[in-house]
Amino acid sequence: MQKGTLIEFWLHGHRHLAVVDRPKDNKHWIVVDHLNQAHTINPRQITYTIGPGYTTAEIPAFQAAVATQLDPDSLEVAWEILVEEGRSVDPAAMSTLLFADTEPVNCYAAHCLLSEDKLYFKQKGDVYEPRSVSQVADLKHQATIAQQRQQEWETLLSRLQQALAQPGSVDWQASDRPRLEALERYATFKEEANPRDATQAQEVLAALQRPETPEAAFDLLVALGLWQPHENLFLRRSQIPVQFPPTVLAMATSRLDAPPADADRDRVDLTHLKVYTIDDISTLEIDDGLSWEVLPDGREQLWIHIADPTRWVSPGDELDLEARRRSTTLYLPTGMIPMFPPEIATGPMSLNQGQVCCALSFGVILTPAGAVDAYTIVPSRIRPTYRLTYEDVDEMLELGVQAEPEIAAIARWGMVRSQWRQSQGAIAIHMPEASIKVQDDEVTIQLLDNSLARQLVAEMMILAGEVAARYGQAHNLPLPFRNQPQPELPPETELLQLPPGPVRYSAIRRCMPRSEVSLSPARHASLGLDTYAQVTSPIRRYSDLLAHFQIKAHLRGETPPFSAEQLQEVLMSVSAAAQEAVWVERQTNRYWGLEFLRRHATDLWQGLVLRWLREHESLALVLLEELGLELAMRFDRPVALGEQLTLRVAYVDPRNDVIHLREVDTPTVTDLPKVEQLA
């Protein structure tokens, strides 16, 4: 290569012109640029040779001359000619086409235009081939989309900055949703998020100079006002729908405006009965009521009236399919997510005080010992007389209110019934139960005591379930029977060594097998019943609604809407959704339990050692007795089951499900209760 040859090579990602000075060795040359700076290059690094006869002083003028010729629009005109001719070109040929000569300045300008072009030409060796018309059209379309995306990206960043500066001031656009949803999924699923979502979310976080972590994504969504500080990630990870589709809401409205014909035209009129509904004060879906009467022959009859949503819902309609998809009403500390639209669930479906309501009523006569002597099941009309809370009923029973003898009679039969089930092998487990509520960001925890009112309602619901199952079994009716295998409990002598109360109940609870839903009736061990089906919550539990569909059709003399095979198929999908709902409820309650403890980090709590989780690691389950919360705790000293402790929160992080408790006062080993420990 001659000294004085002007060449192009790339330096730090940019074109660079230099004049060849001398060889350095057999493989390298020394070239000098316009700043008289020397560079050592390999000939393979040369991307274009302009020609000999140049000095470094001439480079700036040469570059200025080239700059005047760099018109990208002229390349399109040349492409139109060449694509029609089907001819490839090199820089010299393109210079001739564009500038009508092959002067070094124009040839180099043509080289720059061709090598920088990504639209009209593609390089093949030393020549450039024109792309086809369709290829150019596709590339232009892609470029337009890329430009649009870049503009949307820049606009999104601008809106994000505005929202961070002034929360609530931004109207998000449809084009923002993909990035914001990716951010939500990254914060929700964390390391398990889709890689594409993670990448998009991390790009947003990086652009806002925030850590590229799921926790930072969560904090950003809160700062933007899109999420609450205590956003329910368990609910977001689930498939549980929060909003009702428009078609379902439309059907609910139409059923309210124009009620369908009642399939049970011969409903029994029970409006003469005094009906008590007994629930928590916050209950909105009122699905059961109780009555008591004395028959002409002197026998006493209990009535358990269950709300009849099948008056408003038919198998396979929009309301039914949506309820099936949800499977249950979800009860969370922050509120409920209903199975049916609220306007119909808390309206005509519910047993509202003073209104004539449709019900499925179970009339039961018990033997003096508490066994079912006779029963009847009828579609009915009732008029609930009183809406009472559990506290109201407990007070009435305590005071012996003479004006309401029905309440005392129902409570008496509830106790008889409980004793009868105990004689049949029922297994009672009375563990403290916490009710966690969040109202206006205030977290409260209330212990639900096993009061007489709660016991009598529970016994009546269990009674209705036994009667429904008996009816299904007697008529060979496909129903979702609920069964529970007999547990293998520790020997009584071993249980008696444990402190009575929560410790002993915890040991029994640990041995209890899960209840199962089956089309075949079988014993329910913990209830002490030979057959049982849940039917008392059809507004909020889809399996109960299924039982109503089946029983009511049979009462009318019709073929049940679901065959055994169809019922089994529906139950499989419903059971999976119900299990997910239970998981969300459990995890959400735990989160708010930990949040309550975080807010009361300096408070002292009375703890009780329930059982060992891993005794060799000194890891036990403790019960915070005032709160009904069960938490794992690791000890650094010997402890005994049933030992009472004074505890304080050492560290708690609700979002990451971490809590560490510590003892405030540590007794000596000699002070430990002498209790046989049952792992």
Roles of regions detected by a PLM:
Residues 50-61:
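Compositionally biased alpha-helical segments
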Residues 115-127, 227:
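A short, conserved structural fragment
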Residues 124-140, 236:
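Accessory beta->alpha helical hairpin/"wing" motif in late/C-terminal subdomains of nucleic-acid enzymes
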Residues 168-272:
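Low-complexity, highly charged intrinsically disordered N-terminal segments
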